[in-house]
Design a protein with these regions (language model features):
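Extracytoplasmic gate region of multi-pass secondary transporters
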Residues: 11-72, 160
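Interfacial helix-cap and linker-helix signal at transmembrane-aqueous boundaries
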Residues: 44-45, 75-76, 163-172
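C-terminal ends and interior cores of transmembrane alpha-helices
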Residues: 91-104
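Hydrophobic core of transmembrane alpha-helices in multi-pass small-molecule transporters
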Residues: 27, 110-124
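Intracellular juxtamembrane helix-capping segments at the cytosolic ends
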Residues: 124-137
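Symmetry-related core transmembrane helices of the 12-TM Major Facilitator Superfamily/SLC fold
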Residues: 176-193
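Loop-to-transmembrane helix entry/capping segments in MFS-fold secondary transporters
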Residues: 51-52, 139-148
Length: 212
């Protein structure tokens, strides 16, 4: 209650462990999904798929990402932010695993399964990063605080695809890059869980069950 009642500004937010857990969690989450998003077409063409299929997959990931945005936002209002975020990251990891099993163009079904599962997982990021931050640092200066938090997102977007490309150039394989993306997603979910927005503000669904 004391945390929730505090009037936060950038300086006071920067001095907290929760801020840096969210900063690191958001950076790792973005690093994970952008590493895959940027290289997915190259990955598929490297396995002899037509570039047009790669473009189709990009579109499907976007479509199912939109579905995921609605679903994860809805779910987080009922079970809690970090639980929904962890499930979303789990979907992302499952999608990466499915993609990693695609060895050649005979596995078209796996490519479409990847697009659905990864896309839905990818959709967790937009609604949950903002709502988690708002739960933790709600107040008159929230926009400024969230802007600084979002630097982590930008860093992940810049680092992930570049490192993935460098790893491919060094190993002539995406195995290590996909492992990195998987690990980053797990770290992201863990960091958000440790930031524990549930201990600052309970979501409506949890409050309703507690009083039901």
């Amino acid at each position: 209650e004391r945390w929730a009642a505090k009037s936060w500004n950038i300086r006071s937010a920067l001095s907290t462990r929760r801020f840096w857990l969210l900063f690191g969690g958001y950076m790792c989450g973005t690093l994970s999904h952008q590493s895959v998003m940027v290289h997915q077409v190259a990955y598929l063409t490297d396995r002899q798929f037509d570039p047009m299929l790669g473009a189709t997959v990009v579109g499907l990931v976007g479509i199912f990402g939109s579905v995921g945005k609605i679903f994860w936002g809805w779910l987080s209002d009922r079970i809690g932010r970090e639980g929904a975020y962890a499930l979303g990251m789990g979907s992302l990891v499952l999608g990466i695993f499915v993609l990693s099993t695609v060895a050649d163009s005979s596995q078209l079904w796996a490519v479409y399964l990847y697009a659905v599962v990864f896309g839905i997982g990818y959709g967790v990021f937009a609604p949950l990063t903002s709502s988690i931050a708002a739960d933790v640092f709600q107040g008159r200066r929230f926009g400024s605080i969230y802007g600084v938090l979002y630097v982590g997102n930008g860093a992940g977007s810049a680092i992930g695809p570049w490192v993935s490309g460098a790893l491919f150039d060094a190993t002539h394989s995406y195995v290590v890059a996909l492992a990195m993306a998987t690990g980053a997603a797990v770290v992201s979910a863990l960091a958000v869980w440790l930031a524990a927005p549930r201990k600052v503000r309970q979501v409506p669904g949890v409050v309703a069950r507690a009083h039901g």
